[in-house]
Regions:
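N-terminal secretory signal peptides
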Residues: 24-86
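Bacterial Sec-dependent N-terminal signal peptides
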Residues: 1-28
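Short, solvent-exposed secondary-structure boundary motifs
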Residues: 59-69, 101-108, 126-133
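Mid-length scaffold segments of soluble, non-membrane domains
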Residues: 67-118
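Helix-rich interaction surfaces within compact, conserved domain-sized segments
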Residues: 23-32, 111-175
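Short, cysteine-centered beta-strand-loop-beta hairpins and adjacent loop/turn segments enriched
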Residues: 47-50, 90-94, 132
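Solvent-exposed coil/turn segments that connect beta secondary-structure elements
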Residues: 42-44, 79-81, 88-90, 130, ...
């Protein structure tokens, strides 16, 4: 039994050592400063709410207020001239839309304020779109290795957070 425990410990340790960063320091610095990155959402963290907690606790191995989005296409694409957000929303809305296609945080903005502040080992990037219907603010906390958390503040909804990673945008193929 002890040898089995040691074997599992070694396997976990080797796996942890082989865990690779999403991007290296130079790439992360370059894409943040160039205002050209994609935030890929891996988990969603809605605000605590009794009704939502009751639903989430029904899932096996559920961790309160943490929704796994791995494998989804939820992201925020940032370039110098646009911000495109496609993210889900799982919290309380104070002014809901009657349009069923208008759920989540989905917008395209060409007029926005972008600020990136370098801290010791991370960046704080704030994006405020000016041409979207709801007044929103996106705050990214980005590590040197490309891991990021995103907090979305909206006047019509409870705040919501996401964890994920940054990547460089893939170049579109020209036909």
């Amino acid at each position: 039994m002890k040898s089995l425990t040691k074997l599992f410990t070694i396997i976990l340790a080797v796996g942890a050592l082989q865990a690779k960063a999403q991007t290296d320091k130079e790439t992360t610095a370059r894409i943040v400063n160039a205002q050209n990155f994609v935030f890929n959402a891996v988990t969603a963290i809605p605000m605590a709410d009794n009704a939502l907690n009751q639903v989430l606790n029904q899932y096996p191995n559920s961790r309160n207020n943490l929704l796994n989005l791995a494998g989804s296409q939820y992201d925020v694409r940032v370039t110098k001239d646009s911000v495109v957000a496609y993210l889900p929303f799982y919290s309380r809305s104070f002014n809901p839309s009657l349009d069923p296609n208008d759920s989540g945080t989905k917008f395209k903005s060409k007029d926005f304020k972008y600020s990136a502040e370098k801290k010791k080992k991370h960046w704080i990037v704030t994006i405020e779109p000016k041409d979207v219907r709801d007044s929103q603010k996106l705050i990214f906390n980005i590590t040197e290795k490309g891991y990021a958390s995103l907090s979305i503040q909206n006047i019509n909804r409870q705040p919501m957070s996401f964890n994920g990673n940054l990547s460089e945008p893939k170049e579109k193929k020209k036909n």
